[in-house]
Amino acid sequence: MKAIDKMTDNPPQEGLSGRKIIYDEDGKPCRSCNTLLDFQYVTGKISNGLKNLSSNGKLAGTGALTGEASELMPGSRTYRKVDPPDVEQLGRSSWTLLHSVAASYPAQPTDQQKGEMKQFLNIFSHIYPCNWCAKDFEKYIRENAPQVESREELGRWMCEAHNKVNKKLRKPKFDCNFWEKRWKDGWDE
């Protein structure tokens, strides 16, 4: 299968996962905006004949396409060859970082800390590797200013921002009453 580039007349609009393929400004598939499976499909690393995916996103009978390679990097005893993160891995990791930052934010921040948090979130929305995700978060920040007066306000604001994304992705809403247990204190059990 030939790799897709910007010269292709009709690049795929949907990947093997069923998600819409996101292309960057140059018309090339965005690596961090698509799942690994879809990116490999549109770049020709796997073929359209791979429709027999199991429910966990792996090809039936193989461990392929999970993003985890069993080979070690050349000259390494510990580092494995792993592909760059896809949109799902990037999203999970980013939300983990953002929620953890909110959970460690002071209960009573100084004016400097408030300014730094606003600046961090603003910069984050500009540099996020998935361009359409970045624009969406930037828009959310414009329409819903980050609440940085306290840890409680920031944690709830972050939870609400995450739930907005979850809704777009048709994922269940997280009960923001539990944000501290999930991201700061842990569960009582």
Curated annotation (Swiss-Prot):
Domain ERV/ALR sulfhydryl oxidase: 83-183
Impact after mutating residue 159 to S: Reduces catalytic activity 3.3-fold
Catalysed transformations (reactions): 2 R'C(R)SH + O2 = R'C(R)S-S(R)CR' + H2O2
PROSITE patterns reported for this sequence: ERV_ALR
Protein name: Mitochondrial FAD-linked sulfhydryl oxidase ERV1
Source lineage: Eukaryota, Fungi, Dikarya, Ascomycota, Saccharomycotina
Major localisation: mitochondrion
Function per UniProt: FAD-dependent sulfhydryl oxidase that catalyzes disulfide bond formation. Required for the import and folding of small cysteine-containing proteins in the mitochondrial intermembrane space (IMS). Forms a redox cycle with MIA40 that involves a disulfide relay system. Important for maintaining the cysteine residues in MIA40 in an oxidized state. Reduced ERV1 is reoxidized by cytochrome c. Required for the maturation of cytoplasmic, but not of mitochondrial Fe/S proteins.
Listed InterPro entries: ALR/ERV (IPR039799), ERV/ALR_sulphydryl_oxid_sf (IPR036774), ERV/ALR_sulphydryl_oxidase (IPR017905)
Gene name tied to this protein: ERV1
Organism: Saccharomyces cerevisiae (strain ATCC 204508 / S288c)
Key words of the record: Disulfide bond, FAD, Flavoprotein, Mitochondrion, Oxidoreductase
Disulfide partners: 130-133, 159-176
Top EC class for this record: oxidoreductase
Classification via PANTHER family: ALR/ERV, FAD-LINKED SULFHYDRYL OXIDASE ALR
